[in-house]
Amino acid sequence: MSRTVSPSSGTSYGLARVCRIWRMARTTLYRHRQPPLARQRRGPIGPLPDPMLTAEIRAILATSPFHGEGHRKVWARLRMMGIRTSLRRVLRLMREHGLLAPSRTGAPRGPRNHDGTIIPETIDTLWGTDMTTAWTAEGQAAVFVAVDHHSAECVGLHASRQGTRFEALEPLRQGVREHFGGFAKGIASGLSVRHDHGSQYMSRAFQDELRFLGIASSPAFVRAPEGNGCAERFIRTLKENLLWVRHFETIEELRQALLAFRESYNSTWLIARHGFQTPAAIRHKQLPCAALAA
């Protein structure tokens, strides 16, 4: 096109004008006009070219009595055979030809796009629970929390010396007694609990307790803490306002401080997504609707 003669001026259009009209960079055009360069490995070739060295690597893997040997041991066996080459070259060739030792890639996972929401429309629909730790003069203590995903209300807080599956149930028991009026079989039907895949939450005792209360287990995706984000966010608030700023002599003192923090948090902490209302105000506003739905 640049060599085409203009009928009005009698001169060729020129490369600069054509690139400007077509909105194309001249550097890109010059680059594609050059013949492609043959790709060659940089540096010295070594004692063997790549095809022959790959054949030696395959022979080592075939004759080795062990399975799963990686590129480092293959490189060492090459040196024992008198073939001296670099470790990176052995790694590159084994990677290109699929000869590396199998790694723990895990099971194939589905879509991981976090394009949904973990915030339900009403209270007492989805609670989240998680565990953190705190230090006292008696040693480390396990701190368990339970949070309503809709209102961000803390429905349960507990501290214990041991972070067992039985201690992990205490925040949920607190919330069920207060918001469902007791502790009986099927009393919390319609509630789901979001938790991670920790040993406490996946234990038979924990899951049996949920089924007894009528609670549906809702585990988050593996290695996806966003699914339990409400409990994670509350733990951050708890650390910044209590666990990291106060010293506790005993675990019992910590437990009592957690109960006091729960009352203060629910009555004074402001939730931005609800128009800067407190969790207690959100619950009070929805109580008539919840009672009618029940």
Segments the model singles out, each with a brief description of its role:
Residues 46, 195-197, 203-210, 217-240, ...:
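RNase H-like two-metal-ion nuclease catalytic core shared by retroviral integrases
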Residues 211-215, 237-294:
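C-terminal domain-tail junction helix/linker
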Residues 18-22, 29, 57, 74, ...:
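Mobile genetic element proteins and their domesticated derivatives, centered on retroelements
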Residues 19, 30-126, 224-225, 278-288:
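Basic, flexible linker segments flanking DNA-binding modules
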Residues 12-14, 69, 85, 249:
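Residue-level signal for the short linker/turn that defines the boundary of a DNA-recognition helix
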Residues 2-33:
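Structured, non-catalytic alpha/beta "coupling" segments that mediate domain-domain communication
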Residues 52, 80, 84-147, 153, ...:
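Mobile-element integrase/transposase regions
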Residues 1-13, 54, 58-65:
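Short, amphipathic alpha-helical "recognition" segments used to contact nucleic acids or chromatin
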